[in-house]
Regions:
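Positively charged n-region of N-terminal signal peptides that target proteins for export
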Residues: 1-10
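C-terminal motif of bacterial Sec signal peptides marking the signal peptidase cleavage site
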Residues: 15-18
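Flexible low-complexity loop/turn motifs enriched in small/helix-breaking residues
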Residues: 20-29, 33-36, 51-53, 58, ...
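Short coil-to-beta-strand transition motifs
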Residues: 38-47, 253-257
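Short, solvent-exposed loop/turn positions at domain surfaces
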Residues: 82-84
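Short, solvent-exposed loop/turn segments at the edges of extracellular beta-sandwich modules
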Residues: 103-106
Length: 280
């Protein structure tokens, strides 16, 4: 009898190990509104903004909503024509994605996509605008990019939704093969990314025991930020003004000041103008 029990327990352990070795895509919890789903097996629906990739067919998507932070990828090249809308996709569009599951990664990946539909009036390509700004900053004072392994991005002072901020930051860091951290200079200093070295205000070195001044630097990283400024609407167009900064140290930074871009009635943002540029 004991041998039978031991064999039975051994079989249970082998069965559990076999199940654990087969990871499956994670399906989201069903929403409370049953009309939004097609039964317990999906498809599920999610509204996303196309951040980038419409031309290449590899979409980077930001979950739509002021309090949502999901970032997803979707390869439309592998989808049949009946799944895609007839109108070509564009960066900045809102789309509804009907899917069966998503894989746990970052960004997450949609699986079992059965349909993609455009959302009327959802065009807003501000993400693409700010990606251009970050890339333009990257090209300025290229010496600040030397030895760079980490890119810090702070878009918290823009009107982008949390998911859009994360998607833009990820796309920028990924394009330069760098690790990404999000946060302000103050936050990254507190987290230990940025070093604060005390300096003497008198030159004697006496006040280094209780320093009032510090030299800040990031040995293997560079920080990029965009801050929007208030501006009134102009006629039928919607403008935005902003400042942008690239920072490596207290004496190594580049600035775009008083930049302006205008959104058309169709939701597309123009190229931006720079009021002035500064270097330190």
């Amino acid at each position: 009898m004991k041998k039978i029990i031991l064999v039975f327990l051994l079989l249970l352990c082998l069965l559990a190990a076999g199940c654990a070795a087969q990871p499956e895509p994670i399906a989201p919890e069903l929403p409370s509104d049953e009309e939004e789903t097609c039964g317990p097996g999906g498809p599920y629906e999610m509204t996303c903004r196309i951040v980038t990739g419409a031309k290449s067919g590899t979409l980077l998507l930001a979950e739509h909503g002021d309090a949502l932070s999901g970032v997803y990828t979707l390869d439309t090249q592998s989808l049949s024509k009946g799944i895609l809308p007839e109108e070509p996709l564009q960066d900045g569009q809102l789309i509804n994605v009907y899917y069966g599951a998503f894989t746990e990664a970052w960004p997450m990946n949609f699986g079992g996509v059965s349909s993609i539909e455009l959302v009327d009036g959802g065009m807003d390509d501000r993400c693409a605008l700010y990606l251009r700004v970050l890339e333009d900053l990257w090209e300025k004072d290229s010496g600040l990019n030397d030895g760079l392994e980490v890119i810090g991005v702070d878009l918290s002072q823009t009107s982008l939704a949390p998911s859009e901020r994360s998607a833009v930051a990820w796309a920028f860091a990924e394009s330069h093969e760098a690790n990404l951290v999000e946060g302000s200079l103050e936050e990254l200093t507190e987290q230990g990314y940025i070093t604060a070295t005390p300096i003497s205000s008198t030159g004697s070195g006496v006040d280094l025991n209780e320093p009032k001044y510090y030299f800040y630097s990031w040995e293997n990283g560079c920080h990029f930020s965009i801050i929007e400024q208030p501006m009134e609407d102009t006629y039928s167009l919607t403008p935005v003004t902003f400042d942008a900064q690239k920072w490596r140290s207290s004496l190594g930074a580049y600035f775009f000041s008083n930049c302006t871009a205008v959104q058309s009635a169709l939701g597309e943002w123009s190229d931006y103008t720079i009021g002035s540029e500064m270097i330190s």
